[in-house]
Amino acid sequence: MSPQTETKASVGFKAGVKEYKLTYYTPEYQTKDTDILAAFRVTPQPGVPPEEAGAAVAAESSTGTWTTVWTDGLTSLDRYKGRCYRIERVVGEKDQYIAYVAYPLDLFEEGSVTNMFTSIVGNVFGFKALRALRLEDLRIPPAYVKTFQGPPHGIQVERDKLNKYGRPLLGCTIKPKLGLSAKNYGRAVYECLRGGLDFTKDDENVNSQPFMRWRDRFLFCAEALYKAQAETGEIKGHYLNATAGTCEEMIKRAVFARELGVPIVMHDYLTGGFTANTSLAHYCRDNGLLLHIHRAMHAVIDRQKNHGIHFRVLAKALRMSGGDHIHSGTVVGKLEGERDITLGFVDLLRDDFVEQDRSRGIYFTQDWVSLPGVLPVASGGIHVWHMPALTEIFGDDSVLQFGGGTLGHPWGNPPGAVANRVALEACVKARNEGRDLAQEGNEIIREACKWSPELAAACEVWKEIVFNFAAVDVLDK
């Protein structure tokens, strides 16, 4: 019998139910560089102390169960258990607390976002002692980061592949998202790329439906982008959505895209799942394909302030699982996105090292070591009048994607693309000359309208379109 087993046997087994805080609330614990750290927003049921609630989260997301079990004596709980090491009250909220939990790295399989989430956000979110629970942030230690491939290529490699520098990239989601035939779909792709866009995009729910099978769409879109490349002298791309009902079918579609010689494919990473996404990211790295990621279903998970998973966590998970682009909100468009919060997770997507900054919702310092960055994609209800704000908010390393803001142009798709390209070039030029895009944005666009009738027409159509709704998910004040 080993000394470890002898020690545990000597303690003896006492059946029954213990309060979680007796084992899992350890305010004296000093976190290790190798721990995964989590910040949970906890809303306990009436009568449940915050220490017990925080300890319950640590227990149920690591080694604990509802009662003492004799097999606890066969392992080292002190080595493997999660620990709630700090609790702080949320200012301005009744009965809400931030519980900080540390997890030993040995609890997680290397290179598996799936396993990490199965532990940290598995059964614990249905725990009866909690009225609500939200995972606000994770600190991923470098030791765990290094077990992931991450994005297939990253920002610099993508720019080198496309030979495009010094400005944001421009995209367009083809509309209507459902119902077009493959040939008409390809026509819209060609017209937008020919007009000056860098990318066009399948919408998230375009897979392989009766009105347009995936193989037909891939063929017509490849023809469209090659024709646009020949006529413009610029490298073009279309995000061919490879998302499918099985991983095998998804990879088959990615293989066909590679055989066509296109530069980029797409995946819906939340509905498709992290295992499928990581598999596709590895295929894209090995075969020179860029990977665009759509976040369909994210608001089901992240929009409510007191329950779910914050998008900054989903963004970190995507960087680990793999993707070269991901939709990140616009701040100014039709979709949810508060400015400081959005800029916080945009930095977490792009930068190598991000300091803790609670003013932007960042609970932990994050060191990504050598993991490539991800381009944030601003998309959803944006048009030419938003271009100065988008350029100022997101900077050069971003993709600005106008669907209705291109295809809704009164003169057609090519002039819609021209209007967006002219507006972007005008904003970049003004910024490089030292002008303030936030203060002078409208004036910059009006000046550009004088030498671009396409832009002038777009400005007239969308001059009164705004989306003035308060964000649901805002920072604690």
From Swiss-Prot:
Modification type N6,N6,N6-trimethyllysine: residues: 14
Q: Does the keyword Glycoprotein apply?
A: no
Q: Cite the post-translational modification comment.
A: The disulfide bond which can form in the large chain dimeric partners within the hexadecamer appears to be associated with oxidative stress and protein turnover.
Pfam families this protein is in? RuBisCO_large, RuBisCO_large_N
Q: Does the keyword ATP-binding apply?
A: no
The record's cofactor note says: Binds 1 Mg(2+) ion per subunit.
Task: List the catalytic activities from the record.
Answer: 2 (2R)-3-phosphoglycerate + 2 H(+) = D-ribulose 1,5-bisphosphate + CO2 + H2O; D-ribulose 1,5-bisphosphate + O2 = 2-phosphoglycolate + (2R)-3-phosphoglycerate + 2 H(+)
BP terms from Gene Ontology: photorespiration; reductive pentose-phosphate cycle
In terms of SUPFAM superfamilies, this protein maps to: RuBisCo, C-terminal domain, RuBisCO, large subunit, small (N-terminal) domain
Keywords, ordered alphabetically: Acetylation, Calvin cycle, Carbon dioxide fixation, Chloroplast, Disulfide bond, Lyase, Magnesium, Metal-binding, Methylation, Monooxygenase, Oxidoreductase, Photorespiration, Photosynthesis, Plastid
Q: Which family does it belong to?
A: Belongs to the RuBisCO large chain family. Type I subfamily.
| Other observations noted | The basic functional RuBisCO is composed of a large chain homodimer in a 'head-to-tail' conformation. In form I RuBisCO this homodimer is arranged in a barrel-like tetramer with the small subunits forming a tetrameric 'cap' on each end of the 'barrel'.
User: Which PANTHER family did the record assign?
Assistant: RIBULOSE BISPHOSPHATE CARBOXYLASE (PTHR42704), RIBULOSE BISPHOSPHATE CARBOXYLASE LARGE CHAIN (PTHR42704:SF16)
Quaternary organization: Heterohexadecamer of 8 large chains and 8 small chains; disulfide-linked. The disulfide link is formed within the large subunit homodimers.
Give the protein name, as stated in the record.
Ribulose bisphosphate carboxylase large chain
